[in-house]
Amino acid sequence: VYVRRSNDIMKDRERSNLWQVSSNGDDHRPLYSGLKSARTPRWAPDGKKLAFVSNDSGSQQIHVRWVDNGETALISQLLESPSSLSWSPDGKWLAFTMNVKASSESIAKPRTQPKGASWAKKAITVTTTQYQYDGQGIVEPAYRHVFVIPADGGSARQLTEGNFNHYGSLAWSQDSNRIFFSA
């Protein structure tokens, strides 16, 4: 399975869909496509399911698709966009990383607005140089942490914390009890 990207000239957006290719490279066909986008496909250890991230539900969420019947289930209700999906070897869990908003310290104390005054919007204080990839604004201060969620759906559980980021791949121990990552 691979991600096939295209540009929607009418909506000025990039779209990505999941396509499947045979092992000899001859047969390319859409596995999960539509007007929304899908990314980060990961096969379950038994090869019967595929986890991926899609915005079909309105925001970036984790979905699982059963390859034999084509059914797809939304398994998460996350506040931020997940990435770096990784199946546990027993197929019961999915690990992923996700941003957790950080508290930002103000460098100046704002004045109190007098009653009845009509002021402009408060200024945005930028303490980091993280901008949205689409150029539409500033990314709020956040740190990327490791989470797990049951592969059949449920509540996500945060495993790491602190003022540092976890980027890159996540790897499970063979007994599905530990996750290895770099911070």
State the predicted function of each range.
Residues 22-26, 66-70, 150-154:
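Short loop/turn segments that connect beta-strands within beta-propeller blades
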Residues 1-18, 141, 170:
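Beta-strand-rich domains and repeat architectures in extracellular enzymes and scaffolds
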Residues 18-20, 62-64, 146-148:
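Hydrophobic beta-strand positions in blades of beta-propellers and related beta-sheet-rich domains
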Residues 19, 23, 27-29, 33:
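N-terminal accessory segment at the very beginning of proteins
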Residues 6-10, 56-59, 101-104:
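Short glycine/acidic-enriched loop and turn motifs that connect beta-strands
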Residues 1-3, 33-53, 71-72, 79-97, ...:
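Conserved beta-propeller blade repeats
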Residues 14-17, 99-147:
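Predominantly five- to eight-bladed beta-propeller fold
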